[in-house]
Structures are given as structure tokens and as C-alpha cells.
Amino acid sequence: MDHHQSGTRPARRIALIGTDFDGTVFAGGDTMVSAEHYRAFRRQLQHLRGAFGTHWAVVTGRHVSAMPLLLNELLMHGLSPDFMVMEDARIYRRRGSRFRPFWWWNFSIWLRRRRQLARHRERVRATMASIQAEHPTAVSMGGNRMIDLWYEFDADGAAVAVERRLLDQFAGESDFFVFRWGREVCLAPTAGTKGEAVRRLASELGAHRREVFTVGDGQNDISMLDPVAAGLIACVANAQDEVRIAVERAKGFIASGQHIAGVVEALHFYAQKKA
């Protein structure tokens, strides 16, 4: 039997598993991933939950409105997280069949982000007006959410062009970072990172950082792939160069497998490695 599928008791306690979604747990696009990798991950979760009461959090930059879609995609593989962290830092905990927000935590994230945006309000609005004029078919994804400048474009080229423009325009800014998911591009306030959310969850669970496992592939994952947030750090083989560098610097594990296969590999590495 494959070692990822074995029922042996894990050698190390892992209290919290924090995984990115796009590019990590799910490949997206036309990339084909074997269902066996998801079955292996489900078995790992079952073993860890049975042995240590381990909790699993999906930590994603996706809008809160995308939560039902993500949960359905996970459910198709028999997976159900204990927490959903949306827009990098907004925390929701599973209660029965529903996910309930961490009201005060989420409000504090909202307030900090609004203050950051307020300091650059005119500049951000001018940039949004320019983007809308140049790309009239772009769909604004911001609305009343925590991030104003968030667009979905109808072509990859347009998204890449706007991403590059924002990177140049806001280079060196400590209040913002630029991120792109396929055809979606956002200018995100730096307040409320994935790393902060993971630390908040660890505190909620009474878990020491040495009992926290995190894995990702993209730039906005770097804050949780940091020894300040987690002691068991990993990235999948398809991770961006900046992410691999961050994991190497943290003396973490770089998987040879891509997407969920890499998650299974990294989790097995740490679960069977004595503390």
C-alpha cells in the first residue's frame, strides 16, 4: 500500500492544516488531476482528525460570494473543511451545514482595509476610472466588499496588461499588493493577510505554531508560509518562484508533486517526521 494511504498513526501532532485553494488544492483550468490524490488527502485528514482532532482551513483570496462554489467543488471529492478563510483573512467556521463568521475579527479586517484605502482614495478611484475607460467590458468584482479595485476581464491578455500596470504604478507601496487569478486582477490592501488569519485560527484552537501546517503556491500565500505563522511549511511543485524562495528560506518542504498531489506529499512528510 502507498505510504500516503496507510493507516499508521502519524508520528507528529498537527493541530491545524492551512491550504490555499486555487493552484494548490485545485488545479483549475483544463489541468487534469487524478481523483486518487483527493482520496489520499481525505484519508490523511481522517487519520489526523482521529489521532489529534486536527482542523483543516481552506485559506483563499477568493470573494466570500465564491464560498458555495468552493464548498461544492470540495464536496465532490468528499472533502469538508472546518474553516473557510475568504479574501485572504475573513474567517468562517463550520457549524453543522453552515459556516458562521468570526464577526469581530472580520470587522477589524474590514476597518483596517478601509483605512488603508482611504489614505489613497483619489489615486485608487482615478486608476479604476482609467481601467474602466480602457476596458469597458471589464466586470467590477469589488462592490461593497473589502477590496474596491477588483476586475474580471474577458481576455487573459487584458488581465496580464492591467496586472503589469498596477505593479508598476504601485511598486514599493506598503499599503497594497497586486494579485491576479486567471482573468481576475485586484489591488489588495495589505491589512489582513493569510498569515494573520492562520495565526488567529491557531490561537482559537490553542495550537502552537510548531503544530501548524501550511501549503501554497502563489504570492498571497507567502505570509502564511512564514515561521511566524507556521512551523510546518511547504509549497507544491507548481509554486511561483517567489514562493519557492520563501519556503527555502524558512527551511520548509518543496514537494515534487503539483497541486493536491504535492499537498499529500508534503503533509505525509511532516506527519511521519518526529517532532
Q: PLM features: residue spans?
A:
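Short, aromatic/basic amphipathic alpha-helical patches
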Residues: 71-73, 162-167, 242-250
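Mg2+-dependent phosphoryl-transfer enzymes with acidic/Ser/Thr/Gly-rich catalytic loops
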Residues: 12, 187-188, 195-275
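Conserved acidic, metal-coordinating active-site core of Asp-based
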Residues: 126-215, 219-227
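Basic, amphipathic juxtamembrane/active-site segments
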Residues: 29-48, 234-237
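Short loop/turn segments at strand-loop or loop-helix junctions that form parts
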Residues: 17-24, 87-89, 96, 143-146, ...
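Active-site phosphate-binding/coordination module
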Residues: 39-134
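Asp-based phosphoryl-transfer active-site loop
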Residues: 10-31, 225
